[in-house]
Amino acid sequence: MTKLNLWNEGDPVILRGVYNNHPTYVQSVRVIKDTPEETALLVLPGAECMVPDGYIHHAHDASKWDRWQETLANSVQLEKFTWRTNRFLILLEPEKFYSTIYIWEAASDQFVCYYINFQLPFQRTRLGFDTLDLDLDIVIEASHEWQWKDMDEYQRGIRMGGIQSDWVKSIEHAQSEVFARIEKRAYPLDASWLNWRPDPNWSAPRLPENWDEIN
């Protein structure tokens, strides 16, 4: 890292979900851009990650896996997993309660959609970036038609106390900002990155041995 604590293009780092100083998800990524105003991270097929074992084996069965119950009890068990399908470009902006993601189908290189992931504002660490996924998402087509995703999970997180009331207020404010961007086709929902492609010499990054260290 530089004296400004900014990463260089191509650097392998990790993006983590962290709750109460416990990693709940860890994704290896490559840095595409890192400035005081914006950070862009690349998820490539083949990238290593650590995912809750309940998500891997029971993601669609709420009777067998409850994300917030595990998270609140600090009992999340992470299992190594290899990302296989789409290519993600994750755009982070300081202090914002969401990230904007460009998604391409890796095999065909076709753009799939924009994706708004509501999350805690990111924090820089010596390993990369920490945040926390807050379940709620918006899927935005290339035509800018949109739909909510995971609203039930978001409401459950609120009811269980995992998603705090002040976070909810910040997400409501963030929603207004996102909808204004959709309506105006404003950056980054303006296809600015649509034709961007990763360096073909970049390999999918691996996780560092100390992926679980909290700064």
Positions of PLM-derived features:
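Charge-rich, low-complexity N-terminal segments
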Residues: 1-85
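A hydrophobic, small-residue-rich beta->alpha segment in the mid-to-C-terminal subdomain
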Residues: 134-181
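Cysteine/selenocysteine-centered motifs that mediate thiol-based redox chemistry or coordinate metal-sulfur cofactors
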Residues: 173-215
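A short, polar/proline- and glycine-enriched secondary-structure boundary/capping micro-motif
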Residues: 50-56, 126-127, 157-161
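Hydrophobic residues embedded in beta-strands of well-ordered beta-sheets
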Residues: 38-40, 111, 146
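Short, solvent-exposed aromatic-acidic interface loops
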Residues: 45-50, 120, 151-157
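Structured beta-strand/loop patches that form or line metal/cofactor-binding pockets in enzymes
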Residues: 82-136
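Short acidic-glycine loop/turn motifs at beta-strand connectors
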Residues: 34-37, 106-108, 140-143
